Amino acid sequence: PQTNQPQQEQQQDDGQQPETQQEQEEQSQQQTVTAPSLSQQLKEAKAKNDDIIGWLKIDDLKVDGAVVQAENNTKYERLNEWGQYSWTGTYFADYECNFDSRESLSKNTVIYGHNVDFNDNRDGERFSQLLYFADEEFAKQHPYVYFTIDGDDKSSEMVWEIFSVFYTTTDFDYIRINKDYRNPQEGEITDAQLMNIIKGAQERSEYDYEVEVSGEDKILTLSTCSYKY
């Protein structure tokens, strides 16, 4: 799944009632989604492994654990979040992504996880669980992904709204983070490049989420293998 930029938690109102019916209807359409508090789990995990940079959670799935980042994308392919051998690996962020703060997050934050079942068993480990989103009812009932990074305030606890769920072949460069793979020093992708990723994801999406996303946003991409093709 791909999700658009993290939602800000809405402030509480002053307790006054709306003056018009229109204001009441507009207020009822607003939805406040509060990120679960994952900071303590993250803090305890990071004390055991400094490569841990975040905590990822999706309601009603086994996706609820630490996310690591190394100097390359191969170190944790067969290691768990504690650095111990594991066939299913762990959730790991692309080495090019930035997690210094919420404000400095990459325009496209990419997190990988294995699907090691050749039959695409959605009850498997790690990102095998993402296959639950192939079920439209489940997908519609679970529109959010929660991702928390290390930080000193609540802004590090983020809610991301899903705008696309798709299968793709490798000709779609949806995991691009920098302008140029060969010259990462040129910086991250432009708004136009991000918009191309967004449009490509929406065109391939299994469902129409009707979520507005622009090239000025930041997105979170969860990526795994599938044996569908």
What is each model feature region?
Residues P1-Y229:
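Solvent-exposed, non-transmembrane regions of membrane-associated and secreted proteins
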